[in-house]
Amino acid sequence: MQWTSLLLLAGLFSLSQAQYEDDPHWWFHYLRSQQSTYYDPYDPYPYETYEPYPYGVDEGPAYTYGSPSPPDPRDCPQECDCPPNFPTAMYCDNRNLKYLPFVPSRMKYVYFQNNQITSIQEGVFDNATGLLWIALHGNQITSDKVGRKVFSKLRHLERLYLDHNNLTRMPGPLPRSLRELHLDHNQISRVPNNALEGLENLTALYLQHNEIQEVGSSMRGLRSLILLDLSYNHLRKVPDGLPSALEQLYMEHNNVYTVPDSYFRGAPKLLYVRLSHNSLTNNGLASNTFNSSSLLELDLSYNQLQKIPPVNTNLENLYLQGNRINEFSISSFCTVVDVVNFSKLQVLRLDGNEIKRSAMPADAPLCLRLASLIEI
């Protein structure tokens, strides 16, 4: 029964190929005819309908009937709001504050974003050691005015928002309980090897839009890290080792020119890698660099590649637009081409290269039979 199905599949393929043998581009016409939605060829991620980095801050647990009586609102600083229906939340955002006010001990969620705060003085949170979230993004905080131990007593802190400030170095020490750390849109130039030491519970680290030139081995101890964003920096090298739990790595818009052989094997759960707008060449990539069975999406667009690097057959989305690729090698996708061995690739972007449609091998439709979008 199995051989009958295989022979039937092969026969259908031969029949389809013979039917369109007068049109060398029949496969492209077929793929376009199957697209049911509008496609923008300049959109690097045409199927991505969500914001890559959703930015929302919860408002904390609400007071419900039957709970203990709400606390006395008189302990709330006059510069802020402490609504009775959110008894553990203090809202001090968008008030032109230049300093951090007193924080009552009952607070777990404090919001100081979008003010003119320049410093985080030592001891400012010592009265509220049960804090879970601190939002300080969108201020004018500088590194020399952040108390060195200002966060050390917050043993329950889970989320810290310090993005969109004027920080030039990593804050610390930070509590081990931290799960999300937002330091993007600052002026940080390096990440010392011990800057993130002990943060074994950290799942998301946002360092995009800084001036980072080196991260060294600072990421190795982050055994729970799932998302790492280092995009829009000045990195010339990838980090020395990746956390084993990592699923999303964003390093677009840097100066990376090489990726070591088998680099991603240390992150067996990695799903998404974005290395667009770097300085990658084929000489800087080994043959097994991207042959990771877990990868679903790989973005190498706008680099200096001349050949398609070999990828694993499990890859679903490959973005190579804006390079210097001048040949189409089917072996980059399928080491063996037949009716039972094929790539799972669905989206392939090759537009903006030096390759022509006529370079497409005759056996490409058999290898890339699951593709729904191919742009050349």
Curated annotation (Swiss-Prot):
Glycosylation-annotated residues: N127, N166, N201, N291, N341
Entry similarity comment: Belongs to the small leucine-rich proteoglycan (SLRP) family. SLRP class II subfamily.
Residues with the Sulfotyrosine modification: Y20, Y38, Y39, Y45, Y47, Y53, Y55
SUPFAM superfamilies for this protein: L domain-like (SSF52058)
Stored InterPro entries: Leu-rich_rpt, Leu-rich_rpt_typical-subtyp, LRR_dom_sf, LRRNT, SLRP
Disulfide bonds: C334-C367
Post-translational modification: Binds keratan sulfate chains.
Signal sequence region: 1-18
Biological process per Gene Ontology, one example term: transforming growth factor beta receptor complex assembly
Taxonomic source organism: Homo sapiens (Human)
Name of protein: Fibromodulin
Keyword list, A-Z: Disulfide bond, Extracellular matrix, Glycoprotein, Leucine-rich repeat, Proteoglycan, Pyrrolidone carboxylic acid, Repeat, Secreted, Signal, Sulfation
Role of this protein: Affects the rate of fibrils formation. May have a primary role in collagen fibrillogenesis.
Domain of life of the source: Eukaryota
Domain LRRNT: 67-105
LRR repeats: 106-127, 130-151, 156-176, 177-198, 201-222, 224-245, 246-266, 269-289, 294-315, 316-335, 344-365
Keyword Signal in annotation: yes
Site residues, Not sulfated: Y63, Y65
The gene coding this protein: FMOD
Modified sites of kind Pyrrolidone carboxylic acid: Q19
Oligomer and partners: Binds to type I and type II collagen.
A GO CC annotation given for this chain: Golgi lumen
Subcellular location: Secreted, Extracellular space, Extracellular matrix
Entry-linked PANTHER family: AGAP008170-PA, FIBROMODULIN
